[in-house]
């Protein structure tokens, strides 16, 4: 497999952002005992804040909808009980031999025992990709419409404690951005905001989605989690699907990383996809931010979360994103913990083999070489013409700063040509409304 030959160790391109001035962090006893403590994320300010009184990250805040569901308990229990070191080569080969794979098979495919068999796994994943998606690669682009945020997520460039330029697009600016994107030929758009109900309320997002429907055939949102009735409203405004990153499924680590704001509430975020499906959304996307914690356990929990949702809501469409941690403004030291390119390939292939019908996106966080090869092997959806700043598609100068650094700056035209060179079929829209 030619693509396998191009998957090498992690890209070590030099960071371009100014590092945070305070890099020496005094670890707590809990952090010292944590084998997956990612020191690159923490700075002195975060360490100081974490010693203050913090709210219970498992307690719902006022106005948050509570579902009568057991999915959270099932997923967290399975994640905590997942001992990937107990799996053997025989377990991995057994998983590869199955036509329909179980959660136990998925666990084996994510284990260290699977790495020596990565080429065989990739070939199997490629066959599943061909079976369900043929040579198709679906294109989309993100549109960041606001970067105000009320959360304190210490690894995120938008977090409320990070000193960046903030902006929110008005109606005229939204139209200008959408027209600029539409002129490239793009027909699917993903609308994103920072997590601030005050500065980017649901009505504002809904109005942006109504505008987007005038220019694009498919509209998705990646915003702060909302209640079922609010997802229903956004669906009425033209939204087809909702993506929410859980970031990490390790509840204790989640509490260390999300120090303030609505995002601190772990269960409310976990149930976002279920509320979206109840609100009438056609599809939902899930992801862990690989490198925040033990990536194998987080990938296992992500896959199991989607699996259980699919059993409960068989009409829904499900998708995975596979992001790795990236540097941000004011901290260029951030890096994914032990998630090199071989490990990333293992995760994406495991997703494909476990839920072969699910869409898999590889974002512009990855370099062009890795993205192209993953499309050839197991992924089927790619972003193009990406700008994570506010107003970056049409303005000569961004109105607001970006969320994180990207590693693939290619235009739609350039990625379209790259896919054709790989004998893949670019697809700009998969749906027709009648």
Tell me the role of every PLM-derived stretch.
Residues 160-177, 181-276, 282-286, 292, ...:
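Core AdoMet radical
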Residues 125, 153, 191, 244, ...:
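Conserved, mostly hydrophobic/aromatic
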Residues 141, 178, 205-209, 231, ...:
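Generic structural signal for well-ordered alpha-helices
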Residues 131-173:
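Canonical Radical SAM [4Fe-4S] cluster-binding loop centered on the CxxxCxxC motif
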Residues 235-241, 280-282, 356, 376-383:
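Glycine-enriched alpha-helix->loop->beta-strand junction motifs that scaffold or abut catalytic
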Residues 228-236, 293-307, 367-377:
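Catalytic cores of alpha/beta
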Residues 100-137:
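An N-cap/entry alpha-helix motif that binds or orients negatively charged groups
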Residues 1-114, 311-434:
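Auxiliary Fe-S-binding modules of radical SAM enzymes
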